[in-house]
Structures are given as C-alpha cells and as structure tokens.
Amino acid sequence: LCLSKVNDEVNHDYIMGLSTFFEKRNWNLFVYATCTDLFWNTPEDRGESAVFSLINYDITDAVIILDEKIKSTVIIDSIVRKCSEKNTPVIFAGGMPKGHYSLEFDYEEGFAEVIRHVIDDHGVTDLHMIAGIKGNDFSESRIAVFKKVLSEKGIEFSDNMVSYGDFWSVPTETAVNKLIDEDRLPEAFICANDTMAVTVCGVLADNNVRVPEDIIVTGFDGVEAIKFSVPKITSCLCSYDDMARETAALLDKLFGGDMTDSRVLITPRLLPSESCGCHCTEPINTSLYLNEVNNRYYRFQEESFALNKIAARIQMCLNIEEVAQKFNRAQYFYNMVCVLTPECIDESIDPAKHCEKKYAEDKLYQLFNTDVDNAYKPRAFDRNEIFPQIKWVMDKKIPLIFFAINFMDNPMGYVCFHFN
C-alpha cells in the first residue's frame, strides 16, 4: 500500500480495515508512506519519496495506491511503471486511471440519496445548495447531481438556488448571511460537505432560525465533527472500512482469475440524523470520546518532548554506536526498527554524494530494533530481507509501515513500524 499521512483518520481507517480483512486471508500488508502528500516537490518531498524504492516487486502480489493522498503524478507514474515491468497488478483506491483496477466512491449516487431523502421523506421542495469552489470538479459534479435530482422530482432549477461556500466556513457564513439579508432562506440547505453544513447550522442559530424545525440542513462525507454538532448533521458516509472490504474482495477475484470488471463503485451510506428531523442512529458517548482526544493530545506533547530530547543527545554522540545506545534508553520507542544505508555507517563517506542510489546496496545496517534484546548496535543484514527478523513479524500478520529517513533530498535509511 502506497500513501501519505498514515496518521490521517481516513488513512488510518483504511489501513486498519485492510489489516483486518488481509489477516483473515493469511495475507501480509506492507505500507510505504510519506509524511507529506509530495505536492510541492521540495527537496524534503524528494527525500521522503525514496521510501517507494524499497518495494521489492519480485515478492509483491499487488500494489495498492491511495492516489488521492499522493499528489505527485511523477511518483505515481514511477510506481506504476515498475509494476508494469514486473507484471504486478496495480489497484487505485479512490481514482480511475485507464488500464488499471480501481475502487471509487460513487459520490454522485451518495449525494443524490441525501437530496432524495429530503424531498421524498420530508416533503421539501424549496431547496438551496451550498456548493464548494466554483469550477472545482467535486463541486461542479455535486451541482450537476442537484440539478438532476430536482429534474427527477419535477422541481424547476434556477441559478439562484446555488451559493458557493468554497468547502469551508468563512465563505459559507458570507453566503448564508447574504440569503438572510435578502430574505431568501429556503426550506432546506443541501451542502456539498459537512464542514459547510455545520457552519450553516451555526449561522442560522445566530439568527434565531431553528434546525430542523424551520430549515433542514444536510452535509456530505460523514466526518467525525457531525456527531458533535448541534443538531447532529444528516450526511452520507464515505466509509474507508467499506473501501478496505471491497479492496480485499477485488484481490480475491484478481488472484482467483475471476476478475471481470476493472472498476468497483462503492456507494456511500446515508446517515439520517437530527438536522433533517430524523433521529440520530449512531449515538456517541461524548465523555469517552473527549477522554480519548485528551489522551492523544497529552501523548503528542510527551512524545514531542522525548523526540526533542533524544535529538539533542544524538548531537553529542561521537560515533554511530553511541547513537544506537541513546535509543536504547529512550522509553518512547517501541515496535520499530531503524535501518541505515552503508554511507551513514562508514564515517569516511559523505552520504550526500551517494543519495542517488536509494537503498540499492546489497547490505543495510540495523541501527536499533526495539523488540530484540541487545539490538542497539549497528548490524548488517541482507537488503532483500528489508526487515531483520522479518519472518517473525510476518507470521503475526501485522502490517509493516515504512518511512524514509532523509535529510533534504538525501535518503539515509528508513524506519519500519509494526504495531500490534
């Protein structure tokens, strides 16, 4: 799996889903990730992208690219080209490139379901859409769906039934306040995403307009924030757990030779809730959720402090062995292996002069391994292993998550996490 930002909630859900469905099939998941989406092509981006050169296509049955999360077509094309050379199938999750397998959310049908729910189940015919950015593909597509459903229901469309909120709060506030000033409030606001729907509810509340008693409001995407808004927002969930399930099913067919359609559409789930007058079907324990958020924040603070402290200690080390021992005494490192290239181990070599190799050497060096006793010293291992004690981890069917270690555009090694 190739993607960026594993800490992003959507990406995390997808990895967790794949891990669950793959484990049932006795498959292994290797995740190659970057911290940024690689859009700007900075030296740091180029250094991070070296992680994708770690992929061993000789032992890879399929490559999944979450292409909405990798913004560099150069990097994606490079991965696809190498897959093609090895006859390794490529699956695009979230995209539709020609000549490859793809899984996509049927955004149009999901958005149409929201509009039909408002018209059919709540009897509303006076609707106003808060679209995204004018000219944006997603925004224009949802406007087209809005027009289509209105036509289906015999409701005449006019251009003044659409305002633009640019997918975020401030332009949405401006758009709704303009409608209030012009005394043009509709019976229902259909918003192109959840952020704008939450904002609409806030502006209406500030003007003593009740939701849903006076005006219905709906969103789209199913983000976490809608569970805590007042009222809770009716939306449509693009579930990455569903995406993971369908990915595994597609691979079943692919490996079994039963693949007939290269494109899989996943219909988002309608989530009726309070902002349209329905009951919330997914109540949430806010105190438990807040406790989890607080724990994440405190952990983030503690680990940031620990990273800064060990970075300062490393600056005082005289050799690579001392560096390894500093990690041995760092309590916040676990379930991970740190690997360096030979250039980083050999003090006579300037690593910057060998950056073009990108892990091409036959040998790599384990700097430390948090789950093996006495493993806090450099140790050579074969490049094809990619991970010392790899069989032990693979037998557990735990996803391996790789990140490049780089300084600017110079790849110096990588870390591999194997969280249970």
Where is each model-derived feature located?
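Bacterial carbohydrate/catabolite-sensing allosteric modules
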Residues: 1-309, 313-317
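Allosteric regulatory "coupling" segments in signal-transduction proteins
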Residues: 346-381, 388-390
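Acidic/polar, low-complexity linker and loop regions
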Residues: 302, 379, 404-408
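PAS/Per-ARNT-Sim sensory domains
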Residues: 171-174, 382-386
